[in-house]
């Protein structure tokens, strides 16, 4: 039962944390019925798919999985912040500056202590306020 409710999601997140995107993608592709995962693990499944897609420059897939992950409303602020940052960055690259600013405002409303993410937010804030 645990396998169906949790799948390889913890291992996927560990692979992503270590920068092993290819291994994370292989593990994600092994999940045949993501709807059988618990709601929290479904949220992290889509979170991981969004990160893999962003890494591969697949903007549409990254946006789709980011929205799916956020819809569960079960991720921690740090993960939500990462998704908002990725969405803001993509919107900026697509010259959709108002949308980028909206994602940045949502990101700034979170309580995230991650220094790396804070630096990225400052950089994005700087280019958007020009």
Listing of model-derived features with the role each one plays in the protein:
Residues 1-17:
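Transmembrane alpha-helices and immediately adjacent membrane-cytoplasm interface residues
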Residues 8, 21-22, 59, 97:
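TPR-repeat structural position
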Residues 10, 14, 41-51, 79-89, ...:
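"A position-specific structural signal for the A-helix of alpha-solenoid helical repeats
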Residues 28-33, 66-73, 105-110:
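Amphipathic alpha-helical segments of tetratricopeptide repeats
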Residues 37-41, 74-78, 114-116:
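Short coil/turn linker motifs that delimit alpha-helical repeat modules in TPR/alpha-solenoid proteins
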Residues 100-130:
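Terminal, low-structured helical/coil segments at or just beyond the last alpha-helical repeat
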